[in-house]
Amino acid sequence: MKLIVKVFPEITIKSPPVRKKFIRQLGKNIRTVLRELDADIVVGGVWDNLEVETRLTDPKVLQGIRERLSCMPGIANFLQVAEYPLGDLDDVVAKCELHYADLLPGKMFSVRCKRAGRHDFSSMDVEKYVGSKLRMQCGAAGIELKKPDLVVRMEIRDQRLFVVHDQHQGMGGYPLGALEQTLVLMSGGFDSTVAAYQIMRRGLMAHFCFFNLGGRAHELGVMEVAHFIWKKYGSSQRVLFVSVPFEEVLGEILQKVDNSHMGVVLKRMMLRAASAVADRLEIDVLVTGEAISQVASQTLPNLSLIDAATDKLVLRPLVATHKQDIVDLATEIGTADFARHMPEYCGVISVNPKTNAKRNRVEYEEKQFDMAILEQALERAKLVSIDRVIDDLSRNVDIEEVSQALAGQVILDIRHPDAQEDQPLQVPGVEIQTLPFYALNSRFKALDDTRQYLLYCDKGVMSRLHAHHLLSEGHANVRVYRPS
C-alpha cells in the first residue's frame, strides 16, 4: 500500500527553513508511530508531500496505518494511491480504467488531475482527454463537474503517475515536536480531555498534570484517559504524567478558607503547583479546560484572579465553547465514555460561591492557608512517562489469576469497545459480558454479587488494576482471567 500524505496548509506558507523543519519532523513522527505496525515502513519526503509505503498486505495492519495517520497532527489529508511510470495520455486512461471501470457504469463523473513537473500537456488537457475516453469506454452516464456521483482522481509528478483509490481526512495542525511544550491540568472530565486534544491537534506537546482529590480510583481513571489521548493522538512523542496528591491541600482549604471563596482559592493553588511542576520540566505554558461562566469559578473576574497566581501563560482552548459542543467533541475523539464515569470533585466544595471575587478578599483567605502543605504536596508529586503509566500502576499488585474459566463463572471483557468489536472473546460454555474498563468501577456494584467475575483484557494489566481496586472496595468475587 502506498500513501501520499498532504501536510497542513499553514505549513506550506512558512519560510523554506521552517517548512523543511516541520516536514522533517512530520516524517519522523510518522516513522515512530507506524513502526509498531511495520518495522520496515518507508517514509520519504518532497517539498509539500510525504510518501508512505508498506509491503504488508494484512487488512488489519493496513487499516491500523490509516487510522494512525488520520489521528496524527500535521496531516491535512492523505491519499491511497497506485503508482505507475508516466506514459502517454492513452496509457493514463488505461491505468485509470483499471481502478474505476467497475465504478463508472451509470454514474455522472468528473476527472481531477494535479500535476507537478515539466510536461507537454496541462492538467486540464489530462482531465478532458481521460474524461472523454472513460465516458465512452466504461458506460458512464455522463460528465458532471459541479456535483458528480464519482470523481476520478490522479496526480502526475514528473514521470510518475498516481491513481487515487481513496482520500482520508487528517487532523490538521502542526507536527508534534516542532512547536513548544505545554502542561495540561487534567481532571479527566469532558473539558480537560477535550482541551488536551485541541492543544495536541494544533501541534503542541501536552504533558499531563493531575491533582488527586479523590483517591486511587480517581487517579486510575485519569491515568487511563490521559494514556488513551496520548496513545491515539500523540504517541510520536514521549510525555509525562504528573500526579500531585492534593487531598491535604483540599482539607486545609475546607478548614481555613471561607466557603464562598473555596473554588477560586483551590484553582489558584492548582495553578501555583502546576507552575512549580512546569518550572521543573522547563515548560512555560499551562492549559486548562475552563470555559467562560460554565461554573462560578470561571467567570471573567474569577479567571483573572486565578491567572494572577502564576506568571505562566494560561491557555484555555475551550474558553468560548458551549458545553454541548464540548460533549459532542469528546464523543467524537473517544473520551466521552471515560468522562461520564469520572468523579468530579472541584465543583462540589463550595456553597453559594462568589462569581465576582475580590483580590484583597482572596489574598486574605489565602493568608489563613498553611503554604507548607502545598510544598509537601509538590514534594510527593509523582512523575511517570505516559507510556509506562499503566504498567507502573500495576506493579506490586498481587491478584489471583486463573487460566481457565469454570461453569457458573462470568468473564467480564473490560477491553475498549473497539477491541471488543474487532476481536470478540469466545470461551465455549462460559458466560461472557462486556463492561469497558472505564465503566467498571461505577457499574460493578449493580452486578449479581453471588457470582464470581473474571476480568479480562489483552495484556492483563488493566484487569489486575481494576481487580485490585474492586477487592479493596470489598468485592471479594473478583479474579483475573489470563488464558494460557
From Swiss-Prot:
Query: Which Gene Ontology terms of cellular component type are present?
Result: cytosol
Q: What is this protein called?
A: tRNA sulfurtransferase
Annotated active site residues, numbered on this chain, are C457
One GO BP on record is: thiamine biosynthetic process
Task: Tell me the enzyme class.
Answer: transferase
PANTHER family recorded: TRNA SULFURTRANSFERASE (PTHR43209:SF1)
> What are this entry's molecular-function GO terms?
ATP binding; CCA tRNA nucleotidyltransferase activity; tRNA binding; tRNA-uracil-4 sulfurtransferase activity
Task: Give the species.
Answer: Pseudomonas syringae pv. syringae (strain B728a)
Q: In which pathway does it act?
A: Cofactor biosynthesis; thiamine diphosphate biosynthesis
The record lists the catalysed reaction(s) as:
[ThiI sulfur-carrier protein]-S-sulfanyl-L-cysteine + a uridine in tRNA + 2 reduced [2Fe-2S]-[ferredoxin] + ATP + H(+) = [ThiI sulfur-carrier protein]-L-cysteine + a 4-thiouridine in tRNA + 2 oxidized [2Fe-2S]-[ferredoxin] + AMP + diphosphate; [ThiS sulfur-carrier protein]-C-terminal Gly-Gly-AMP + S-sulfanyl-L-cysteinyl-[cysteine desulfurase] + AH2 = [ThiS sulfur-carrier protein]-C-terminal-Gly-aminoethanethioate + L-cysteinyl-[cysteine desulfurase] + A + AMP + 2 H(+)
Intracellular or extracellular location(s): Cytoplasm
Keyword Phosphoprotein (UniProt): no
UniProt similarity note: Belongs to the ThiI family.
Where the record annotates domain Rhodanese, the positions are 405-483
The cross-references to Pfam families, in alphabetical order and at most eight, read: ThiI (PF02568), ThiI_fer (PF22025), THUMP (PF02926)
Tell me which residues bind ATP. Answer: L185, M186, K267, G289, Q298
- Origin: domain of life: Bacteria
Q: Which cysteines are joined by disulfide bonds?
A: C346-C457
Sorted keywords for this record are:
ATP-binding, Cytoplasm, Disulfide bond, Nucleotide-binding, Redox-active center, RNA-binding, Thiamine biosynthesis, Transferase, tRNA-binding
* Function statement: Catalyzes the ATP-dependent transfer of a sulfur to tRNA to produce 4-thiouridine in position 8 of tRNAs, which functions as a near-UV photosensor. Also catalyzes the transfer of sulfur to the sulfur carrier protein ThiS, forming ThiS-thiocarboxylate. This is a step in the synthesis of thiazole, in the thiamine biosynthesis pathway. The sulfur is donated as persulfide by IscS.
* Enzyme Commission number: 2.8.1.4
Residues covered by the THUMP domain: 63-167
